[in-house]
Amino acid sequence: MNKIFAAFKPKGLSSNAFLSTLKKKYKNKKAGYSGTLDPFAKGVLIVAFGQYTKLFRFLKKTPKTYKATLWLGVYSLSLDDQNIKEIQNIKEFDLANLKQIIDQMQGIISYTPPQFSAKRINGTRAYELAKKGIEANLKPCQMEVFDCKILSYNHPFLNIEITVSEGAYIRSYCELFARKLGINATLSSLERIKEGKFVYNNEKSLNVLKYINLKPNFIKDLNKLENGAKIFVEELEFHDEGDYYIETEKYFSIINIKENTVKYLLNKVEKC
């Protein structure tokens, strides 16, 4: 069974553990996901079955949008509602001041990923090492904040909606935001509501061709795709270098054009 959809991962499960529940639910062992959410976070997780597990690298998965609740005045080793070491009663902030900092933190931001993150270190998630008391050597990164707005402020809880680039960590954004206020802060909740064009819709099966970040190409002799025969650039409508998809009534293939040579990246993937 080929299928791709947006699932809703609950809080408290790793993305791998959640995928295992979906494998059992749909009775399909060949499954995968893209865009890991660590156990603290909940929300949209792109899941695929069958041949569609090979399509993740072609999907348009940015920007990503999250809803987050910042708990002001709280110090947590994991920057979430666990491992809390200190809770301070701090004075309520002026909303205009908070909005000013939000506006300042737009565009490219440099940061170091948090120890409790889904970042892989030699094949192991950073949060798994952190739980064992092992501090990972995480390199500085950059993320882009496309938009951020305050949804509500009920001191000490600040609710925001933030849209960011792939690879961004909202925990790190929270930490940087708190530094500008001169306080500690942690996340009390985190939900991914959108990943690219993917939104949760009761695990409805999606037309993958509407979600891949590729242009269509065309060939008159569709039998070549059916048979996996060699394709020459001259037979295609578009000759520019790059990746494309070509579809028939029942299947589609993904090809690459480079130096006037056509190569199959995936061939005869059955439509769902």
UniProtKB/Swiss-Prot annotation:
One Pfam family here: TruB_N
InterPro entries in the cross-refs: PsdUridine_synth_cat_dom_sf, PsdUridine_synth_N, tRNA_psdUridine_synth_TruB
Keyword terms, alphabetized: Isomerase, tRNA processing
EC number from the UniProt entry: 5.4.99.25
Listed GO biological process terms: mRNA pseudouridine synthesis; tRNA pseudouridine synthesis
Catalytic residue positions: 38 (nucleophile)
Catalysed reactions, as listed in the record: uridine(55) in tRNA = pseudouridine(55) in tRNA
One function term, GO molecular function aspect: RNA binding
Protein family: Belongs to the pseudouridine synthase TruB family. Type 1 subfamily.
Protein role: Responsible for synthesis of pseudouridine from uracil-55 in the psi GC loop of transfer RNAs.
Listed name of the protein: tRNA pseudouridine synthase B
Species annotation: Campylobacter jejuni (strain RM1221)
